[in-house]
């Protein structure tokens, strides 16, 4: 499983894509890098409501307070969007996640204007769910 890039490398790689077809392919590639979930993790408590596709997100906190996120989707582009969100929240504490606004990063990537309305709504649902889970941990 290849490692995900950090925020800055994500932005650089995204800006190097020549067009939106390449950007979508890059997003799909990022999703393929996510570690698989265990069968038990495909549970009701990990499913994200408000997404047209099936989305599961698992959150854990290590002893130093850093949050780890793992997830999956039955749709390739959505799985890639999960990876993008995880990159943005990487190495953060629960409080950091609550306070961090991912939207400026999406604007830098011009992501939201190139997603269908249902994918944009699903992306917002993922962010809300991650922030809510972080609030329950902190």
Curated annotation (Swiss-Prot):
The lineage of its organism: Bacteria, Pseudomonadati, Pseudomonadota, Gammaproteobacteria, Enterobacterales. Participates in cysteine desulfuration mediated by SufS. Cysteine desulfuration mobilizes sulfur from L-cysteine to yield L-alanine and constitutes an essential step in sulfur metabolism for biosynthesis of a variety of sulfur-containing biomolecules. Functions as a sulfur acceptor for SufS, by mediating the direct transfer of the sulfur atom from the S-sulfanylcysteine of SufS, an intermediate product of cysteine desulfuration process. Homodimer. Interacts with SufS. This is Cysteine desulfuration protein SufE. It is found in: Cytoplasm. Keywords: Cytoplasm. Its main location: cytoplasm. It comes from Klebsiella pneumoniae (strain 342). Coiled coil: none annotated. The active site is at 51 (cysteine persulfide intermediate). InterPro entries: Cysteine_desulfuration_SufE, Fe-S_metab-assoc_dom. Belongs to the SufE family. Pathway: Cofactor biosynthesis; iron-sulfur cluster biosynthesis. The keyword Nuclease does not apply. Disulfide bonds: none annotated. GO terms for biological process: iron-sulfur cluster assembly; sulfur compound metabolic process. One of its GO terms (cellular component) is cytoplasm. Gene3D superfamilies: 3.90.1010.10. SUPFAM superfamilies: SufE/NifU.
């Amino acid at each position: 499983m290849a490692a995900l890039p950090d925020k800055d490398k994500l932005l650089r790689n995204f800006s190097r894509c020549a067009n939106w077809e390449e950007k979508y392919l890059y997003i799909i590639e990022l999703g393929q890098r996510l570690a698989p979930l265990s069968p038990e993790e495909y549970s009701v408590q990990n499913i994200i409501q408000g997404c047209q596709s099936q989305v599961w997100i698992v959150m854990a906190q290590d002893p130093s307070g850093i949050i780890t996120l793992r997830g999956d989707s039955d749709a390739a582009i959505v799985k890639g969007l999960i990876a993008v969100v995880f990159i943005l929240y990487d190495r953060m504490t629960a409080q950091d996640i609550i306070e961090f606004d991912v939207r400026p990063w999406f604007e830098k990537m011009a992501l939201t204007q190139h997603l269908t309305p249902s994918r944009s709504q699903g992306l917002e649902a993922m962010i809300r769910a991650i922030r809510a889970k972080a609030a329950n941990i902190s």
